Amino acid sequence: MNLELGAGRKLLVKERLEVPGNQIPLLLDNYIDFFTLLSGERQGDYDRFKKNMQLRLNALSIGDRSSPWYNYAQGEINLQGALIKAKFQDYWSAAWEIKHASFFLQDNFKKFPDFLPDNNGRGLLIALFGSFPPGLKTAVGFLGMEANTTEGIQLMETTMKRLQSGKYAYLYDESALYLSFIQSSITDSPDNYNRCIERCKQIDSQSLLKAYVIGYVALRTGHSDVAISVLNARPVGPQYVPFAQLDYLSGIAHLNRMDSDASTYFYKFLTENQGISFIKDSYLRIAYSAYLVHNEIAYRGNLKKVISEGFAYSEKDKQALREANAGIAAEPLLRARLSYDGGYYDKALAYLTAINIESLHEERAKLEYLYRLGRIYEALNKTADAMHYYLLAGNHGQNSPYYFAANAALHLAMIYEAQHDFSHARNFYRLCLDMKEEEYKSGIDNQARDGLKRMK
């Protein structure tokens, strides 16, 4: 998990020479390719990965069927293949990899119910399905698979705790990092940060993947100062796989703080990045930086690059393109949004309370104002105020294409659920699902469906 992939390759060469009949290096070779693509997203690496993955599966298929490692190794390779193929928009092929992974891991569970390594992959499959992009969700849906985020995360959490000791303890780091990343990506809970920090305490400080996951989770949960500290202190050296996305995360953290050097991190990412994700979003955030210092030329120029450069594959890049076409929000709203994202809630509230809502003429701006006040008050544990503004956002934006009303309904439902008012919670989860927002719909709807499942 340190992402010292060159050293890993050398160890696998040594293992093959010393134990030529051992098939586990086939799985570990796939890990190396998997992490290379997660950090780099290069098309040439992807083409090689698909070819090599199939060769590895062919070799594993003639192994010892009486061993739990027979199904496990094939299931893990299929699962890694599914995640990478989904990243490259190869949805139908990814769907078949998911089907094969599910078969191998479930079959193994039936034959070897005490084989703990299976549970990470099984939990991951169950949790992730609902958060798949629409194209992949459609493809997998034809294969008859269903999701349950809560059930999947619970299985991963139970597995991680059991991996803290015993003969499979070497899998703890992987389990803790995957769980922290997945939980933060598909559930919206302030507890995700503390959970991540606690899980990762025992992981080697020289793990580049650890730095990435903690930085990512810190950003997702409003801890930009922590993200900056962790990413600045990350291990460096030629032994590590190139990971340009770490500079992208640093840029977001610095922009949330409205630091004057935020753009330098995005430019570094754009220079070193060879992948397909976050190019549009980087140019949008460079435009934000210019906008905040009233550099009209740089602002307009980078908005044009949002439209002309990169790909609209990831949700962040799709949203960046929408915003570039619509125009950036009024400056106080943008400052409030960035401050909120960074965890600077009092500062965010000050920006918003200085705004007269009547001065906001566009529907999107008014909805964001109401919604953002709800989010800030919820973060400040002022629940009644949060619910008031969530209701206003929901009522004003119920037929809007923007995500504010739907996410407001989702948060109202979660508040009612926490208060054990399940009748109101169900109503707002259903209202959330009925809305026709065009932004972040898959992720919002998945959380609403999962909320309804919890109350059955």
Feature map (PLM): residue ranges:
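Alpha-helical repeat scaffolds
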Residues: K10-K14, Y46-S61, W92-Q106, G144-M160, ...
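Short coil/linker segments at helix-helix boundaries
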Residues: L3-L11, D29-F181, S185-R195, R199
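Generic helix N-cap/helix-start motif at coil->alpha-helix transitions
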Residues: S67, F115-L116, P134, Y168-L177, ...
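TPR/TPR-like alpha-solenoid signature
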Residues: L27, F34, Y72, L79, ...
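Residue-level recognition of tetratricopeptide repeat
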Residues: Y31, L38, E76, L83, ...
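C-terminal soluble interaction/assembly domains
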Residues: E363-K456
